[in-house]
Amino acid sequence: MIQVKSTCLAYLAMAMMVLASLAVKAEDEMKPFILASVSSGNIADQLDGVKSELGGKGFEVVGEYSPYPTAHIIVVTNDALKKAAASHDRAGYVAGQRVTITRVGDEIQIAYTNPVYMGAAYRVKADLSAVADSLREALGADKEYGPEEGLTAEELEKYHYTFGMEYFDETNRLASYNSHKEAVAAVEKGLAAHIGGTSKVYRIDIPGSKQTVFGVSMAAKGETDNKFMDESFIMNEIDFKPLRSTGHLPYEILVKGSDVEALHGRFRIAVNFPDLSMMGENSFMNIMPSPDAIKDSLTLVAGGNLVDDF
């Protein structure tokens, strides 16, 4: 009898430990986007107020644009983000956080990227919770959203969508130059000429680091008629949930020393849409050519040469 009770107690203790570990994991899980508020009206009515609140909390607006009529994206940075971006030689991607105003039906959704999530995904060696707090104080924080289940910092640091898909550090090398200055000038020149269907959204130079990150919009127009690089087409396929993940845009080019690179599309898309299905309606299958099409446009604007992967 004593042995039976001891066995039962042991199983009960194990069950409690499992439940406790699951609770801790759920508490530590993060999602890529944070909903600030939902209101009525139109996008234009919200713009000045949002930018004023951001400025009041020390954020600098480095760029903004409307990728399509129902969305407006404001890219911000501050000293803490720039410092975090200098924590390693590929951390520049975290420097610009997106604040989005999106019309969905009669609703206006104001949201922003989760800097703590992005910091973990980009392996940043800094605590960005204070940045998240400042965004919350400026705009509000109703809830995190995106995938059904979040990811922990540990999972994000080694994230890839599935076997054979790229990790954070498996980037697309776009071009190489003799110096950082020359590389930056080449990207600026390409963006000014809208090569590859691109336009410049922002530029952030990372203090204390030979990193410069550009935000790049992409549209299939003029001589660039490949719909698979067009951000409107891509978002129409993958951003279909009631709460829109507009802050996925824009894509980035990072000048890292004298080299020019971009995150691989199969990582860049997946880390913001980790529960996107592989096949079916609204799936990766529908945008299968997009990672290569994005790479080609970014390579052209960086002054590089197109090279087939296979």
Sequence positions of predicted segments:
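A cross-kingdom marker for long, charged
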Residues: 210-310
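Short, surface-exposed beta-strand/loop micro-motifs that present aromatic residues
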Residues: 99-100, 203, 250-254
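Bacterial N-terminal signal peptides that target proteins for export
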Residues: 2-12
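Terminal, regulation- and interaction-focused segments at domain boundaries
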Residues: 27-68, 122, 143-218
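Mid-chain, structured segments of secreted extracytoplasmic proteins
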Residues: 72-114
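Hydrophobic alpha-helical segments and helix pairs
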Residues: 110-151
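Cleavable N-terminal signal peptides
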Residues: 13-14, 24
